[in-house]
Amino acid sequence: MTRFFQHSLLALAVSALACGAAVAGPAAALPKDLPAYAADKPLPVPDIGRKTLANGLEVWVVPRDGIPRVDYVLAVRNAGYAADAADAPGFAALLAGLLAEGTAQRDSRQIAEFAQAQGGGVGASVNSDGALVYGNALAANAGPMLSLLAEVARTPAFPESEVRLAQANALQALKAAEAQPGFRANRALLSAVYGEHPYARTQQTEASITAVTPAVLRSEHQRRFHPDRSLLVVAGRIDADTAFALAEQAFGDWAASGAEVAPTAAAPRDARPQRLLLQRDGSVQSTLRLASPAVAATDPDAIPLQLAGTVLGGSFSSRVMQNLREEKGYTYGARAGASTSAQGGHVSGAADVRNEVTGAALTEFFKEYARIGSEPVPATELDDTKRYVAGGYLIGNQMQAAVAATLAGNWLVGLPPEYLGEFVPRVRAVDAAQVQAMAAKYFAPERQSIIVVGDGGSVADQLADWGEFTTLK
């Protein structure tokens, strides 16, 4: 699931430079003879070679001249958090993390040493919609590295010692996370938006971690990793025919075993707004979250909604940041935006504020939510936002590894390969009326659930204007 909170340091630096005047005080007048901004350069859609193996595995090849390197991403649908059982939230994270920690042929050290000998590495990650197994190597070692990636993806052994170590590490990480109010707030946010839908189950629990065994991992791997629900993206200094031949050698005899996971159902879009106060004794600040259901990544509303969210809270110069931080001094940072997945999505807002201004901060959040939905975004502000979103996308997809990851990630959520080059023109085509309509539809104050993590004795009275809150320990 795309998290709008996860900004790269580069994007933050660009944002900070773009809005330095907001930090330093009134901006100096710019010279009148400065040239106009150049038009955004579209990201050219690469010439993608495509082939489907007999077992159903799709293979996309993106030949690129440049550094002598190849990058691989194997994307597997229905292998992510949404495939986890209701009593095993976050299981997919352990499964993905253990893929490269031992196979039927090698232990974890041998895997790491072999990958390093090829001039690269191998690993895996997971999101709500699927799993990603990735690797890279010098172009001269493209074959051996793809064989290793296939070994990791197809024949993980889940050794007892590695499973126990992963569990111990996960329990320590969970203990640290649960001490943070943001972790509790985000867990409550997902539950409020998605209810019993699998998209609510991305955070591990002590019970879900301790219940994992090598046998369970092997069984779930067989259910989740099927060739006919997978895509292999190959990018780098390699021609399509060579890549197809290597893919056939590494994956051609891959056969599904075990009953496959059922596809994820559509997420609800009509969740009743909730009011939750998560008690945190002695807290001197309140952690605020606002959220409501939104759209899937393939919905026509997705890009205009992303722009609305960016205007509202997606950069340092965004409206909620300028209001709550720069004007009011309530917080170090306030943000808002949209997250999309294959079967649904949500909008959310977030800030940590002093106890004394908890209610006032909510007032300012909703003032900005109402304003963006009731009046057009000025042309200059909208154009700046478009350039920020499009520019970040172009910068983020300069490297071939990023292109491979973007293609694989888009495929997981149902977007075609052409979307890689269509994104920037679609962003540029959005007008102020569309942004206003998206804001009015999805950021409407009356649609939002409110989650507050803080000391009820200090802030409960300030929440009365927002309805009756259920207090949870």
Where are these regions (language model features)?
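Non-catalytic, conformational "gating/processing" segments within enzyme and secreted inhibitor domains
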Residues: 187, 197, 214-250, 446-449
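C-terminal regions of mature proteins
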Residues: 25-41, 231-233, 351, 386-473
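Short acidic/His-enriched helical or mixed secondary-structure segments at domain edges of catalytic enzymes
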Residues: 169-188, 266-285, 325-331, 342, ...
